[in-house]
From Swiss-Prot:
Topology of this chain in the membrane: Multi-pass membrane protein
Compartment(s) of residence: Membrane; Spore coat
Keywords: Membrane, Transmembrane, Transmembrane helix
Gene that encodes it: spiA
Higher taxonomy: Eukaryota, Amoebozoa, Evosea, Eumycetozoa, Dictyostelia
UniProt protein name: Prespore protein Dd31
Length: 269
């Protein structure tokens, strides 16, 4: 049976059915339309993003020009506090009310300053007594006492400054307990000077007995005053150690400061 093709009608190949060809062309058209819509959406999103960035930049520049300038203060530790003592020629910082917030620690520092002045006076007077011993050919005693005074007074000063700084930040256990360990050395220092070995530059008990035994009564009387200085110094330094350690432990147990105990500090060394 013959198939007649009308003129003007497109001739379809028998290998590709009409339905398949129409479906493929429709899918291609849909894909092209989908890609076009995505591109348009991306372009709109990008344009919107640029507009927002431009508006944000304009607002920022306007705020910089017309808005208030806020100056953020630096931390307190960035700039050291100015010296204020003595007032005529300030060399050190001494302001208990501003630097030490806790009242009990201010009292400890005041007592520590008194102990420093007492110990410094004891060292100076110890050297004065040794001047009198030169008459009895105890020249070595004089130079040793001079050495103790030159080294001891600055050392005691720096220890007192350490107490001042530790009381300013009592929550830092390392500073507090480092001072207490150094203070134990000062206690031992006073005990040795109180004993006072002969010709050692320490005008204490043994040296006083020796002076009176050899009928050096005048110098012996001066050395007795030095002995009194060291006797009182022993109790002052022990009292300072106990007061500061007890205050630290009390504040720690109450939760007012957060630091480790003295035993934990010793174990960590």
């Amino acid at each position: 049976m013959e198939h007649n093709n009308n003129p003007g009608t497109p001739q379809m190949s028998s290998e590709f059915p009409a339905s398949t060809t129409q479906t493929s062309s429709s899918a291609a058209a849909y894909d092209n339309s989908s890609h076009f819509e995505k591109e348009q959406s991306l372009m709109r999103w990008e344009q919107d993003l640029k507009l927002r960035e431009r508006a944000l930049a304009n607002n920022q520049s306007a705020a910089d020009i017309t808005g208030p300038h806020v100056v953020v203060p630096a931390p307190a530790t960035a700039h050291p506090r100015q010296a204020n003592f003595p007032s005529s020629y300030p060399m050190i910082r001494l302001n208990l009310e501003e630097d030490i917030a806790i009242r009990e620690y201010r009292q400890i520092v005041k007592f520590g300053i008194f102990v420093f002045l007492w110990e410094a006076a004891a060292l100076v007077y110890n050297w004065v007594v040794s001047i009198g011993t030169i008459v009895y050919s105890a020249v070595d005693n004089f130079f040793l006492a001079l050495f103790y005074m030159i080294v001891g007074v600055p050392t005691l000063y720096f220890l007192t400054r350490k107490l001042y700084r530790a009381a300013s930040v009592p929550e830092r256990a390392r500073k507090s307990y480092a001072y207490l360990m150094a203070l134990l050395g000062v206690v031992l220092f006073n005990i040795i000077f109180f004993v006072g070995f002969k010709r050692s530059g320490m005008n204490g008990l043994i040296w006083v007995i020796s002076l009176f035994h050899n009928d050096h009564n005048a110098v012996g009387a001066m050395a007795t005053v030095s002995l009194f200085f060291w006797f009182v110094g022993v109790f002052l330094t022990i009292a300072l150690f106990i007061m500061y350690l007890r205050l630290n432990n009390t504040k720690r147990q109450r939760g007012e400061i957060q630091n480790a105990g003295f035993r934990e500090y010793i174990k960590s060394r």
